[in-house]
């Protein structure tokens, strides 16, 4: 896709590309330039598809983190940083001007709450490490976003 989305059908294509993870920066740029008439029916379908894409990316990011082979400190840090980058990207996705302030705030809060939940879960699971090293790494390389 090489032009900014203007109608719902264009946005559906954009959301599919977003889900695939292909060329994130280019698709984000198109999303920022895109527009849509915010009216009943279209708005609900638009938000539904956007939330599906965002949830898909959130789930994929956490799955990739869990599947990564973290055998040493550097790999753990790299995995945490990759997870944070993905969360930051998803936050940029919902921060586009096409989305009204109320809906944008709700979406942003959903993603921020998810990042907080992931961080809490990581810290809780690190408590079983008797050396405290894993806990220190997780606390010093937080995945939480603002």
Give, region by region, the residue ranges found by the protein language model.
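Short intrinsically disordered terminal tails
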Residues: 1, 145-146
